[in-house]
């Protein structure tokens, strides 16, 4: 169905993109580079598929420049991009830059300054395209001078999804109240979330349904689980910036950090204790499998990335829960929402990424045209519908997006109105090395090989060692 949806969008999209009044400019600008093949690598997500299967084809029809976008797994994408840039081999003309890794890339001077490149090449500046049209998410891809090094192609929040049909079932309501002493409802606290998870696991089993009480992004061999803890579960308990003291770059409590503090340990205990109420695939689930599990009706509730929320709620050929998806902010600990609203914390991760140009690219000018093409306001609405992402301010008011928003229980409205409560990853140039040091401890806690307390004591010590070795600690 995903390919069918994209095919249907192609038939309507191409005409609208070419009718923006600037088709002749694109043809003229692309003429010197006609026949050029741009190689790109990105993660295989719904937004990435739309870019490769729709936008790239329309761009080629206008300019004669072919875009070959290799959408692959997160692991492979990261590995291929960074090896290419480290070796300066020039295999890729553009790469996907995840928000959380951009500081590492900037620190290592991997990327072309797009603002500077366009300023120095006025003939390449597309009419009607302005970097000012983006939401504030573009700020994550700027350096200290405000220059842009990546053009955002996806941005979304991680929301709480729940099954309306299960939560509204009369027998479920009666049984829950009898068992727990209060009314069944989507969770606004962790205690309620845990009760819901326990209840629906038994309710589904008693009614012969293949469903459980919650999703868990708990892969024991993939960084997705570490990210889930550091960027979703932890912040909702009040653990920010990985528990790192941003003045001293220490993460252990005894040195002024918080990674093994009370909030962190409460968060990891809560999360690992959900595993008995999660589908069997939980310990092999990344963000993709979580989306698939929820869409298959295998969970009553869960933290789910927005790139999946829209199709889960609207794509009847791919999702078994269309018409029954509720969307809310995730539960938070007392005080967290206040801290987030005042800018002193955040409730979860504002995820997304951008396309950037490596210094090693052999086709920088042609790639500048491609990145501006995907930055047009005119292409954003269909892209948002296909991938649950919004990078431009005007997209929220597009009639097509508003129609899908209604079907998706107000997901886009929620992102627009509460996105300020979320935040991107902390600005750590050592992001990859630091997260890698934490990974084995999160895996061990999920696998039951270490207690959450011991795992976080080990994780903070390992992270502190990385920061010390790299010279960050005072």
Q: What spans do the regions from the language model cover?
A:
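Extracytoplasmic "Venus flytrap"/periplasmic binding protein-like
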Residues: 54-133, 147, 169-170, 175, ...
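Short, low-complexity disordered leader/linker segments with a strong preference
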Residues: 1-38, 61, 464-474
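Short, polar/charged alpha-helical segment
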Residues: 23-29, 46-66, 161, 165, ...
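Hinge/lid segment of periplasmic solute-binding proteins
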Residues: 20-32, 99-159, 229, 326-331, ...
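Extracytoplasmic/periplasmic substrate-recognition and gating elements
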Residues: 146, 166, 273-279, 317-390, ...
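Glycine-centered hinge/linker elements that transmit conformational signals in sensory
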Residues: 192-201, 235-284, 326
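Short helix-initiation/N-cap motifs at beta->coil->alpha
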Residues: 72-80, 188-192, 282-296
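Long, aromatic- and glycine/proline-rich binding clefts that accommodate carbohydrate-like moieties
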Residues: 23-26, 34-37, 43, 325-335, ...
């Amino acid at each position: 169905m995903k390919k069918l949806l994209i095919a249907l969008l192609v038939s309507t999209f191409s005409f609208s993109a070419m009718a923006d009044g600037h088709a002749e400019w694109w043809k003229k600008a692309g003429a010197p580079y006609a026949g050029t093949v741009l190689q790109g690598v990105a993660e295989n997500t719904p937004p990435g598929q739309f870019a490769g299967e729709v936008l790239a084809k329309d761009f080629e029809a206008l300019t004669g420049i072919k875009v070959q976008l290799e959408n692959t797994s997160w692991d492979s994408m990261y590995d291929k991009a960074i090896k290419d840039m480290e070796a300066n081999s020039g295999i890729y003309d553009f790469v996907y830059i995840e928000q959380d890794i951009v500081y590492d890339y900037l620190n290592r001077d991997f990327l072309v300054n797009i603002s500077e490149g366009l300023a120095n090449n006025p003939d390449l500046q597309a009419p009607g395209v302005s970097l000012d049209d983006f939401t504030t998410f573009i700020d994550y891809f700027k350096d200290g001078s405000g220059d842009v090094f990546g053009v955002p192609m996806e941005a979304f929040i991680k929301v709480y999804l729940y099954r309306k049909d299960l939560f509204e079932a009369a027998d479920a309501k009666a049984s829950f109240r009898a068992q727990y002493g209060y009314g069944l409802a989507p969770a606004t606290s962790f205690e309620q979330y845990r009760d819901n998870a326990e209840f629906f696991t038994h309710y589904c089993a008693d009614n012969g349904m293949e469903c459980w009480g919650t999703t868990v992004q708990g892969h024991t061999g993939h960084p997705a689980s570490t990210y889930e803890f550091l960027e979703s579960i932890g912040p909702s308990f009040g653990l920010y910036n990985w528990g790192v003291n941003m003045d001293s770059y220490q993460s252990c409590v005894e040195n002024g950090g918080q990674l093994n503090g009370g909030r962190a340990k409460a968060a990891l205990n809560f999360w690992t204790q959900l595993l008995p109420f999660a589908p069997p695939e939980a310990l092999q689930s990344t963000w993709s499998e979580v989306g698939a599990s929820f869409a298959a009706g295998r969970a009553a509730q869960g933290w789910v990335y927005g790139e999946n929320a829209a199709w889960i709620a609207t794509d009847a050929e791919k999702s078994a829960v269309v018409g029954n998806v509720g969307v809310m902010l995730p539960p938070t600990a007392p005080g967290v929402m206040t801290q987030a609203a005042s800018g002193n914390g955040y409730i979860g991760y504002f995820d997304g990424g951008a396309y950037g140009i490596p210094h090693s690219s052999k086709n920088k000018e042609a790639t500048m045209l491609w990145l501006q093409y995907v930055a047009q306001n005119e292409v954003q609405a269909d892209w948002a519908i296909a991938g649950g992402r919004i990078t431009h301010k005007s997209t929220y008011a597009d009639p097509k997006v508003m129609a899908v928003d209604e079907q998706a229980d107000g997901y886009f409205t929620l992102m627009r109105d509460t996105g300020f409560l979320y935040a991107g990853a902390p600005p750590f140039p050592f992001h990859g090395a630091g997260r890698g040091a934490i990974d084995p401890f999160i895996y061990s806690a999920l696998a039951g090989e270490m207690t959450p307390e011991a795992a976080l004591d080990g994780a903070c010590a390992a992270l502190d060692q990385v920061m010390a070795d790299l010279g960050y600690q005072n």
